[in-house]
């Protein structure tokens, strides 16, 4: 029986797949938030990420759903921004993995726990950020499903 893919997960990583250092995000950029808003109408996030999206400087039409462990509550077909949770337990539910790369190395003690080589890269876009010269957005789909 084929497993059903149900959500689109969005993450930000550095060159070493780092996501956090000492329980703090490595970096942020308003252009990433605006790009996420162009992809999704509704976004599930944890309270940890709320300030990134509920900010007077960021004007989006996103409907924000804030929940502890948002990835476990995200509705089918929805988008979920993840900064401080492991993805491995949810990999069978991820239809697309949208990865923003800072193209820099930062200190990190919490890293992406999925191997991107096991996913099929379907799109790569580079764009200038507000505080980063170049940000890369990559979109992956699971190889094993052929989706």
For the regions a language model picked out, list residue spans one by one:
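Enzymes that bind and transform nitrogen-containing heteroaromatic metabolites
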Residues: 1-147
